[in-house]
Amino acid sequence: MRRLSMALAATAMTIGVGVGVATPVQAAPADKPQVLSGWTQTSAASYNAWWSARQNQGNWAAYNFDWSTDYCSGSPDNPLGFPFQNSCARHDFGYRNYKAAGTFAANKARLDSALYEDLKRVCAPYGAVARATCNSTAWTYYQAVKILG
């Protein structure tokens, strides 16, 4: 009887393990396109919502967003000391996730405009001379992504 109990227990454990392996991967929530859109608009509120989510990525794991970034790619992340890195990270987020969704072409212009607006917000607190230099640099970055992607 003891052997039978042990055999049944071993079988139950094997079946339990097998069931765990066969669990299907869950699809992303149906509102993923709306969430992505909300985080990639040109407004400061959109940027702030994305920034908050980026700081709490675990809360958004079910959406399978691509949070990876190379920041400003081949360009400096902080040109002339202006901190463009996080704006570039949001731009990467938009590019990578819209490409994965297959809707990049329809959203590229807005994503590039959002980068430019983000960069101008980085520049806004500087004094007149530094702000002009920063805005000029922001314009150059915007033109580069607009043309080169």
Residue spans for each PLM region:
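Bacterial N-terminal signal peptides
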Residues: 9-18
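Extended terminal accessory/targeting regions
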Residues: 2-5, 18-149
